[in-house]
């Protein structure tokens, strides 16, 4: 690893002088991922009710799509960006990197359980074309004290990129992502591991053909492959293509848009079609009151005709307080790729249906002097086909939990607060409670505490997660999850990081259960080096 660091540092010294002195763009529209940039907060991850334990195995480079009906725990309110940070750039990016048209970030790490981690990203933030290119590789083998090669492993590889430029007045936005995740099945069932590959290309054109008017079109694709490895491997293939056309008019006080979309999906050769036609609007009644809405028609081969709509009202009586109320009838299109990544220990339902139903949300936010923020809210929803693991039917033919789509109601309240007096210093807390029947392996109460402090060259951070209120008929590990870490700023370009995760699991007297009998990695330590060039 030392040799790699030396090579990367040498490459940074070889950058042309012109690349070091260019001015930063006013409004860069390629956002840099904070998973690379904010190492002092790297262990902080958003809790979700969709796939408990998924976030504990590998820190995801990007947020995974949530299955229908599973609302997230309110993320801690983000610290307001420092005054010197241009809009659109994360506060963790060093000032010298923001002033260069080309920036590179690299992160290398290794730790217990044969943990290897590498992430490299390039960003073109100057004149067009603007671009982003990122590669990630991470592996764990021998989780929870098991022998390496025994099926207690996890590997994730990602390659993604984006390109933005103009052809005359037409804005062009191209992006693509390739992801591969292999998870050992821990000796359950006839297979060794489950391999998931996804490829998601997309292209969008936007033409402002007249003042206030914009015509846009996009073409998105999605390709997902699942492979159960073993002496008799089994596979599944899903392919989807979706064109869309939209027209929008924006005035100083309101905007109005219409769009149409078609999607064709092939799941192991079986075709299904979806089509939507909808309109949306937004009105600023004053600086303090904004109303937005949408509505239209949705048709699917399996769902038939549906008529979703949504209304939201935001009231901001003063800069410190805002209230958001929303509700309507929504349709959530679920695909194999979404479900495979969100439910790692479950088999796909057959067929995969759209989930639809009524919902209402209410959220209030209070902030004070840009250092303190408090957020609280409630969610209520009804679902016609929400995914839910069936514990009574475990194990399925492949040693996994059958996943069925059921009718269910969901209700939850949540709150979070954050105090951030300085850039590297913060304290936050998040709480969520389920008020209605919730899926197995989803806690009834979630509590998370996070904190960190930074000085000129040193910093520490930690997190504590407490999950309670599980179904007593299932086996769980109730021991809180404690993680600690720290960093040393060796130079302007290099930061060294040490992390220790799940330090309290030895008190449980056994491995930490994810979806019983599947286990999580458990106590582990990692050393990393982050380099900004």
What are these regions (language model features)?
Residues 128-132, 169-174, 210-217, 250-258, ...:
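Repeated loop/turn-to-beta-strand initiation elements of outer-membrane beta-barrel proteins
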Residues 141-158, 175-210, 220-240, 269-270:
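Flexible loop and strand-edge segments within Gram-negative outer membrane beta-barrel domains
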Residues 100-102, 114-118, 153-159, 193-201, ...:
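Residues that define the transmembrane beta-barrel architecture of outer-membrane proteins
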Residues 349-353, 359-365, 373-430, 446-448:
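Outer membrane beta-barrel strand-and-loop segments of large Gram-negative receptors
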Residues 87-88, 97-159, 168-170, 180-182:
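Outer-membrane beta-barrel translocator/receptor signature
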Residues 494-495, 519-533:
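Outer-membrane beta-barrel "beta-signal"
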Residues 120-124, 161-165, 201-207, 239-249, ...:
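Residues on the lipid-exposed face of transmembrane beta-strands in outer-membrane beta-barrel proteins
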Residues 108-112, 126, 137-141, 167-169, ...:
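Transmembrane beta-strands of outer-membrane beta-barrel pores
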């Amino acid at each position: 690893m030392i040799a790699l660091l030396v090579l990367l540092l040498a490459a940074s010294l070889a950058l042309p002088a012109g690349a070091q002195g260019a001015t930063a763009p006013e409004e860069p529209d390629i956002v840099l991922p904070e998973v690379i940039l904010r190492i002092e907060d790297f262990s902080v991850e958003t809790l979700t009710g969709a796939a408990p334990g998924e976030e504990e195995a590998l820190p995801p480079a990007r947020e995974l799509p949530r299955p229908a009906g599973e609302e997230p725990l309110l993320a801690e309110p983000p610290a307001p960006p420092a005054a010197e940070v241009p809009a659109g750039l994360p506060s963790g990016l060093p000032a010298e990197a923001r002033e260069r048209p080309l920036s590179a970030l690299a992160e290398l790490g290794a730790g217990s359980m044969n943990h290897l981690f590498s992430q490299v990203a390039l960003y073109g933030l100057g004149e067009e074309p603007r671009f982003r290119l990122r590669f990630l590789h991470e592996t764990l083998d021998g989780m929870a004290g098991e022998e390496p090669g025994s099926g207690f492993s996890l590997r994730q590889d990602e390659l993604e990129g984006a390109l933005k430029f103009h052809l005359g007045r037409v804005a062009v936005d191209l992006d693509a992502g390739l992801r591969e995740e292999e998870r050992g099945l821990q000796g359950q069932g006839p297979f060794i591991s489950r391999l998931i590959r996804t490829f998601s290309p997309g292209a969008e054109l936007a033409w402002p053909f007249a003042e206030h008017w914009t015509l846009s079109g996009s073409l998105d694709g999605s390709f997902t492959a699942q492979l159960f490895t073993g002496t008799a491997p089994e596979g599944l293939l899903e392919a989807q293509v979706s064109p869309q056309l939209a027209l929008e008019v924006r005035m100083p006080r309101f905007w109005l848009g219409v769009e149409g979309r078609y999607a064709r999906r092939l799941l192991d050769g079986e075709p299904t079609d979806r089509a939507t036609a909808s309109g949306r609007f937004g009105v600023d009644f004053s600086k303090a009151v904004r109303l937005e809405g949408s509505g239209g028609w949705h048709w699917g081969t399996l769902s038939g005709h549906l008529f979703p709509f949504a209304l939201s009202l935001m009231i901001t009586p003063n800069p410190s307080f805002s209230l958001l109320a929303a509700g309507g009838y929504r349709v959530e299109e679920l695909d194999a790729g979404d479900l495979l990544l969100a439910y790692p220990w479950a088999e796909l339902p057959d067929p995969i249906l759209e989930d639809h139903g009524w919902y209402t949300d209410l959220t209030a936010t209070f902030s004070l002097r840009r250092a303190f923020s408090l957020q609280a809210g409630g969610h209520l929803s009804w679902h016609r086909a929400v995914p839910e693991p069936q514990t009574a039917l475990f194990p399925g033919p492949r040693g996994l939990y059958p996943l069925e789509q059921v009718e269910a109601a969901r209700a939850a309240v949540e709150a979070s607060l954050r105090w951030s007096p300085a850039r590297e210093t913060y304290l936050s807390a998040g709480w969520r409670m389920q008020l209605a029947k919730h899926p197995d392996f989803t806690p009834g109460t979630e509590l998370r505490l996070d904190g960190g402090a930074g000085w000129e060259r040193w910093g520490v951070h930690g997190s504590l997660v407490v999950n309670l209120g599980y179904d007593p008929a299932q086996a769980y590990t109730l021991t809180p999850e404690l993680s600690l870490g720290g960093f040393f700023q060796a130079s302007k370009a290099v930061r060294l990081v040490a992390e220790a995760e799940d330090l309290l699991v030895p008190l449980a007297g056994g491995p930490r259960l994810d979806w019983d009998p599947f286990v999580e990695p458990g106590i582990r330590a990692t050393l990393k080096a982050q380099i900004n060039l």
